[in-house]
A protein has these predicted regions:
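Glycine/aspartate-rich loop-and-adjacent alpha/beta segment that forms the canonical ThDP
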Residues: 95-179
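Phosphate-binding glycine-rich loops and adjacent basic patches that engage nucleotide phosphates
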Residues: 32-39, 56-65, 166-169
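Acidic, Ser/Thr-rich peripheral helices and adjacent loops at domain boundaries
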Residues: 47-69, 127-147
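Conserved thiamine diphosphate
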Residues: 51-104
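Thiamine diphosphate
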Residues: 1-46, 82-83, 89-106
């Protein structure tokens, strides 16, 4: 029977990280989807361990001074956790592939989904959140990748970078698209 746990970045990167780590370390066949808004969205957009360095948020008015926790890479260090980073608006096929692979994987899986929210202050509005995800990937802000430990048993590289080479010229425009 399929088991999915869905939560936000605040619970996954910060206040609930111990629980998340415990579930992943258990080796049980459970799937976890983290909606990563990069701030505490439900309480007003405060900075968190998911907030990238330099970002301006509540409690980080001068810009966050420390780097974002790399939750996905931390999970890969176990060696037996399926991990993927997705952005549905950027690549729906990659998103579905990651979800299907996580579902089929006989152990813990963690999918981290880029999820723009109202606290990003999208100048084009939240109706363009899918477009924002696409721009985030195209400019190199957010990377699409998958780590499937089952591939090692087949003698294959378990890591797959699904993003194309970034267009760095679009990075500045991407950042300007948010308040």
């Amino acid at each position: 029977r399929s088991q999915w746990i869905i939560g936000g970045d605040g619970a996954s990167y910060d206040i609930g990280y111990g629980g998340l780590d415990h579930v992943i370390a258990s080796g049980k066949d459970v799937n976890i989807l983290v909606l990563d808004t990069e701030v505490y969205s439900n309480t007003g957009g405060q900075s968190s361990k998911s907030t990238p360095v330099g970002a301006i948020a509540k409690f980080a008015a001068a810009g966050k001074r420390v780097r974002k926790k790399d939750l996905g890479m931390i999970a890969t260090t176990y060696g037996y956790v399926y991990v993927a980073q997705i952005a549905m608006g950027a690549d729906q096929a990659q998103c579905l592939k990651a979800i299907r692979e996580a579902e089929a994987y006989p152990g813990p899986s963690l999918i981290i989904a880029y999820a723009p929210c109202i606290n990003h202050g999208l100048k084009k509005g939240m109706g363009k959140a899918q477009e924002e995800q696409e721009n985030a990937v195209k400019c190199g802000y957010w990377h699409l990748w998958r780590y499937n430990p089952a591939l090692e048993a087949e003698g294959k590289n378990p890591f797959s970078l699904d993003s194309k080479e970034p267009n760095w010229e679009g990075f500045k425009d991407f950042l300007k698209g948010e308040v």
